[in-house]
Amino acid sequence: MAQNSTQLEKISGSFTRLAEAFQLALTACREIEESLPSILGEKSEVSKPFKPAVTDPSNAKKEINMAIESPSKKATSPKKATPAAVAPVEATSAVDTSEAVASMTPNKRKARDPAQPKRPPSAYNLFQKNQRSEIKESLGEKSNDVKEVNKAMHEKWGSLSEDDRKTYEEEASKLREAYEEEMAAYNASKENASVADSRVTAEETSTKPSEDLSSPTKKDLIDFSETRPLAQASRATPDIKEQHAKKPKRKHTRSTVPTSNVEPVSQPQPSPDKIVSSPNPPSAKREKKKRRKSSMSSSITTPPTAKVAN
C-alpha cells in the first residue's frame, strides 16, 4: 500500500507540472497574438516595394512622340540666309536639280525612248474612264476613298451585260491593232538605224590602217647609228653552237711502239692462305641428288619381303 501511494503522489506531481507548463504556453501564445499587429505593421512599412505613379497610355505615347520629334525639328530647322548667299544659289538651282535627277534615275529604271508608242488601254480601263465620275457621285462621302471606288467599279463591271461590254472591247481591239502597226514601224526604223551604225563603224575601222601606214610616227623612226653597233657585235660574236660544230673531232691513234720489247705486267696473285676450297662443289651436290632419287625409286618398286616361318 505504501508503494502504491508513493506512485500516485509521483503521478499527481507530474500532472501538476504539465498543467503549469500548459498554462505558461497559453500565456505566451496570447502575448504573441497581442504583439503580432504591431510587429507586422512595422515590417510592412519597410518592406513595401516602390510603385511608380500610373499614367494614361495615351499621354505616355504623346510624351514619347514629342521627345522623338523635338531633336529632329531642331536639327532640320532652317537658318536665315543672307541675301548675298541666296543670289548664287538661285542661279544654280535649276542646274543642280537636273543633275540630281539624272544621277538618280539611271540606277532605278532605264530611260524610255520617246519615239516608242505607248501601250493601249484595255476594255476595263476604258470603262473606268467613262464611269468613274458617276460612281464617285453615287458614293457621296466615300467618294474620296480609293478602295471603295474601285470596289464599286468592279461590281458594276461584273453586272454589265455582253452588249454593253462589246462597245468597250471593240474600242480596245481597234487601239490594240493601231499599237501593233506603230510598234512594227518603230522596230523597223530601229533595225535600220543599227545597220547604218554598224556600216559607219566598219568604214572607220577599214580606214584606220591606211592612215597609220601613210603617216608614221616619231617612235617608228630609229637612227642608223643606234642599230649599227648591235649589228657589228652580232657579227663579231658567233653563236656557241657554230663554235662547237667547227671544232674537229679527235682521232684515236694506235701507238707505233713494238710490243716485243715491252715486258708484260704481272698481276698480283692471291696468297694460298686466303684461298678457301669450297666444301661442296656443284658436281658433288648433283651426285647426292641422284643417289636420293635412286633410293626413293627402289623403295617404291621393291615391296617388303615377308618372313617365312620355319
Swiss-Prot record:
Q: Name one GO molecular function term.
A: DNA binding
Q: List the disulfide bonds.
A: none
SMART domains recorded: HMG (SM00398)
Q: Where is the composition biased (Low complexity)?
A: 69-95
Query: Where are the Phosphoserine modifications?
Result: 70, 161, 214-215, 271, 278, 294-295, 297
Q: Could you provide one GO biological process annotation from this protein's UniProt record? A: transcription by RNA polymerase I
- Name the chain's protein: HMG box-containing protein C28F2.11
Q: Which organism is it from?
A: Schizosaccharomyces pombe (strain 972 / ATCC 24843) (Fission yeast)
Q: What is the lineage of its organism?
A: Eukaryota, Fungi, Dikarya, Ascomycota, Taphrinomycotina
